[in-house]
């Protein structure tokens, strides 16, 4: 899936995936859930990779919308874990769409790590969950937004 998505340019040649009529907090009166194509007669030119990349990009815009909704500090890095964050490709798009540094966790089984932190705190090995997290969690890879990609996604969002 990722390999196919990587072969498709930013913006998926005009294809978009929407999980609703909003993207990153911007409302569209013409768009509903599903895939949107720039013109119906170009459907034959789209391949599976276009659909895959469109989903990756849509998920990244959803994260951005959540950050904007909670008014997250735009200068602070975004710490991520779980599912899609195992993909370097996804994390790169996320950094570009959100315009901020994305930092993964070294431990991939983050749910188990969280349970261990809670258990160790509960039995008194750590005074609180913050201390457990400071001692037990470590940053993994760091992804920096690429200026040209970030500008592309920002421009697309403005046009939406």
Residue ranges and their predicted role:
Residues 28, 67, 122-130:
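Short helix-capping/linker segments at secondary-structure and domain boundaries
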Residues 1, 103, 127-131:
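Acidic/polar loop patches that form or flank catalytic/metal-binding clefts of enzymes
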Residues 61, 100, 118-126:
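Short, well-ordered loop/turn and helix-capping segments at boundaries between secondary-structure elements
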Residues 19-23, 37, 115, 131, ...:
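Generic structural "secondary-structure junction" signal
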Residues 2-113:
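Activation-segment/catalytic-loop signature of the eukaryotic protein kinase fold
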Residues 124-160:
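Acidic, glycine/GT-rich loop-and beta-edge segments that sit at the periphery of enzyme/chaperone cores
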